[in-house]
Amino acid sequence: MSVSGELSVANGKSTPPKSSISDYIALLKPRVMSLVVFTALVGLMVSPVPINPWYGFLAIICIAVGGGGAGALNMWYDADIDAVMERTKKRPIPMGKISPPKAFIFGMVLSLLSVLVMGSFINWFAAFFLAFTIFFYVVIYTIWLKRITPQNIVIGGASGAFPPMIGWAVTTGAVSLDSFLLFLIIFMWTPPHFWALSLFSSLDYEAAGIPMMPNVRGEYSTKKQILFYTVLMVLCATAPCFTGLGGVFYGIFSTILGIIFIYFAYRLWKANTHDETILMAKKTFFFSLLYLAAVFGALLIESLVRYFIDL
């Protein structure tokens, strides 16, 4: 403890920790934002309409800022449960580094700014789509679904699946079947990803009173549904090959990754003991991160190769 902190305690006063730039960055959920930005970038790059690089860069910044604003609003509302969970109790609001009102204002300013800039400089369709995504994540998922149903991340997961459609809308001013397929891949990926996490974090969620699938339906039902959604996800990931969005490289690569993902999900489903379940849940969770990045990365690589071949 610092000298000033000791004097404050001695005088019967506690000095709240000072906030820093890193605390405000933490409010943005940078790890989540990085996935949002990457999938949005892929949606933008694989769309059939070219865009000025500077406008594309500005659009991605808007999506990142909007995603960060939504993350801050999520932390503002979830401050009570974040303080209970081991995984989240060191976030800025539970630690007292940023007050809830400041977090709320920060999140609202970023959210509104991102939408206004997107509409003013890119197009209003993409801006309204971004606004709807922020609303869906904060209101539909965080405020409404998260604390009342084990299907929270199934329905609420749509908010995390919208970014590639926003990226697509940036260049085209519309949505299409191909952009919807990108949405479906992430939408089906979300349950296996988060339910695997909830299997080895079930005590944390239980302490916070969040009705995640393992706490409500049990381990076996959760593992079975992880396998079910994994198969659906892999099928959705092959669909771009039939529309022309994905080529031979993407088709082979995504299929191999999909088989590996199904293998992990199957091993998790067949796990006989709790310890084995936890081990396989962790492996499935971490592979899911690699899978989504690799599948979207393959689409991006193919798009860039086609671009340079056509030059």
Swiss-Prot record:
It is an enzyme of class 2 (transferase). Pathway: Porphyrin-containing compound metabolism; heme O biosynthesis; heme O from protoheme: step 1/1. Pfam families: UbiA. The keyword Nucleotide-binding does not apply. It catalyses: heme b + (2E,6E)-farnesyl diphosphate + H2O = Fe(II)-heme o + diphosphate. Its EC number is 2.5.1.141. The keyword Hydrolase does not apply. The chain crosses the membrane at residues 32-52, 53-73, 104-124, 125-145, 153-173, 180-200, 224-244, 245-265, 285-305. GO terms for biological process: heme O biosynthetic process. GO terms for cellular component: plasma membrane. It is found in: Cell inner membrane. InterPro entries: Protohaem_IX_farnesylTrfase, UbiA_prenyltransferase, UbiA_prenylTrfase_CS, UbiA_sf. Keywords: Cell inner membrane, Cell membrane, Heme biosynthesis, Membrane, Transferase, Transmembrane, Transmembrane helix. One of its GO terms (molecular function) is protoheme IX farnesyltransferase activity. It is a multi-pass membrane protein. Converts heme B (protoheme IX) to heme O by substitution of the vinyl group on carbon 2 of heme B porphyrin ring with a hydroxyethyl farnesyl side group. Carbon 2 of the heme B porphyrin ring is defined according to the Fischer nomenclature. Belongs to the UbiA prenyltransferase family. Protoheme IX farnesyltransferase subfamily. This is Protoheme IX farnesyltransferase. It comes from Bartonella tribocorum (strain CIP 105476 / IBS 506). The lineage of its organism: Bacteria, Pseudomonadati, Pseudomonadota, Alphaproteobacteria, Hyphomicrobiales.
